[in-house]
Every structure is written in C-alpha cells, then in structure tokens.
From Swiss-Prot:
Sequence similarity: Belongs to the pyridoxal phosphate-binding protein YggS/PROSC family.
Pfam families, sorted: Ala_racemase_N
Protein name: Pyridoxal phosphate homeostasis protein
CDD domains in UniProt: PLPDE_III_Yggs_like
Molecular function per GO: pyridoxal phosphate binding
Native species: Pseudomonas aeruginosa (strain ATCC 15692 / DSM 22644 / CIP 104116 / JCM 14847 / LMG 12228 / 1C / PRS 101 / PAO1)
GO CC annotations on file: cytoplasm
Classification via HAMAP family: PLP_homeostasis
Keyword Lipid metabolism recorded: no
Amino acid sequence: MSTIAENIAKVAARIREAAQAAGRDPATVGLLAVSKTKPAAAVREAHAAGLRDFGENYLQEALGKQAELADLPLNWHFIGPIQSNKTRPIAEHFQWVHSVDRLKIAQRLSEQRPAGLPPLNVCLQVNVSGEASKSGCAPEDLPALAEAVKQLPNLRLRGLMAIPEPTAERAAQHAAFARLRELLLDLNLGLDTLSMGMSDDLEAAIGEGATWVRIGTALFGARDYGAPAS
C-alpha cells in the first residue's frame, strides 16, 4: 500500500470515528482531497486508492493537472479566492466552487457556465472569524447574497464554506463550525452542504455537521509553498 493510500485509510478512519461519535452516518461526510501544489501523479495515486473529489486553489496549476488526468473520472472543486478575470475557466472546468463570496463572481460564473454542462455546484464562503485577511462575506450580508445566488440559472446553491481562524482549542473549533451551521439553518433555503474542517480540526467540524472536509496535509504531506500561485 502506498503512503498516500495509507494516509487515506487513516483519514477515513478519523472521519468514521468522528461521525459515529456525533451520531452521524459516516457516508454523509465527503472527503475532499486538497491537491493544491501536489503533482498530477499524487492525484492519480489518490484516485487509485478510491478518491474522486479533489480541491484546487490555483487556477493555472489546476488546469494543467486536469489536462494530465483527463482519462480519470474526477470531480474538481475550486476552493481558493476568485478573481473576476478567472471566472470563465472555473465555470468551464470545475464541478464545484466552494469560495463564492460576492454576487458579481456568482453572476459571472452563471453567465459563463457552458450550456452543455449541468449547473455548477456552489458554496458561499463566510468569514465566521471576522479576520480582515480572510476572504468570505460577512455573516450579516449572507441572507441577501444567498437569495440572489439561488436565483442564478446556471448555478446550484448547495451551502456554505468557512476557514475559521486556526486554533488548537477544541471548544473554539466547535464554536466556529457551529456558527456556520447556524447560519445555514437560519437561511432556511433547504441547503445541504457545510464545507468546513481540515487536517487539524476535522473531528470538530464533523461534530458540528460538516458534509465536506477539505484535507491536504494529512493525505499528501506538507505542502510545497514554492509552487506557482496563479
């Protein structure tokens, strides 16, 4: 068994244990492998071990990997900040976008989604920690944004995403994820997705209702931050 396959098995066990501890069916928690800065060969290895969903932050890097891996049935999720001039290739080449935080971006994604493709699954990114350096809409702006995005014809609004302020305190982790869950429930729009939790806090996220956990380091090892950030 490869190192990546071993890591996938370990993370799957963590997900299973966390879901069971929360009284949830482990099948309701999706494992999104964050493959940013990792080579296509690592994605291919993860696919061979059973993964199908991969998250990317950097558009040009992602498009290169997608071309290399076109022979595989993969679902690609864009999870990084979105610039207006990058929306067309995102709309054309991804199945999910987790990081929509303003209406202009959502409108462009809807307008640029090719007619032959199903609606693009989107999550709205919320800045639950109030950090000035973090992307995401403010919680008080979320209801209006969600109502507007839900009307766009080529998008399917699925739920919310957050990247809370990193903390080793389990209570603080739970509080941030609970906040996102409450925001989703308050919208009362029948949405089904909470994209939250990473390698160090997936247990707390699952305890508060995560349906996608975004895992990079625990699967692929430490990231190569020298990779191109375009």
